Amino acid sequence: MSLEKTSKAAIVADNARGANDTGSPEVQVALLTARINDLNGHFKAHSKDHHSRRGLIMMVNRRKSLLSYLKNKDATRYRDLIAKLGLRK
């Protein structure tokens, strides 16, 4: 389940720190969050798709490690990103 080119570009533009920024933790976490949300919809219809579930778990763990890195590096950027994406309650 990959993202469409236009939606991916919109996510990158919305979360980028600079003009050509595609690799900052904020952008990576936002892209992973979008893919995770898409896969959650997939699992509502295909609950026994365990092969894709493994990919989902790997994405969640990757996002978790990126968020941990960002929290240790710059706590204000971390809090802003969490609020923007609505990840924590």
From Swiss-Prot:
Keyword Zinc: no
Gene Ontology BP terms: translation
One GO term describing the cellular component: cytosolic small ribosomal subunit
Gene3D superfamilies noted in UniProt: 6.10.250.3130, S15/NS1, RNA-binding
Top-level taxon of the source organism: Bacteria
Family recorded in the similarity comment: Belongs to the universal ribosomal protein uS15 family.
Function, as annotated: One of the primary rRNA binding proteins, it binds directly to 16S rRNA where it helps nucleate assembly of the platform of the 30S subunit by binding and bridging several RNA helices of the 16S rRNA.
The protein's name: Small ribosomal subunit protein uS15
Originating species: Herminiimonas arsenicoxydans
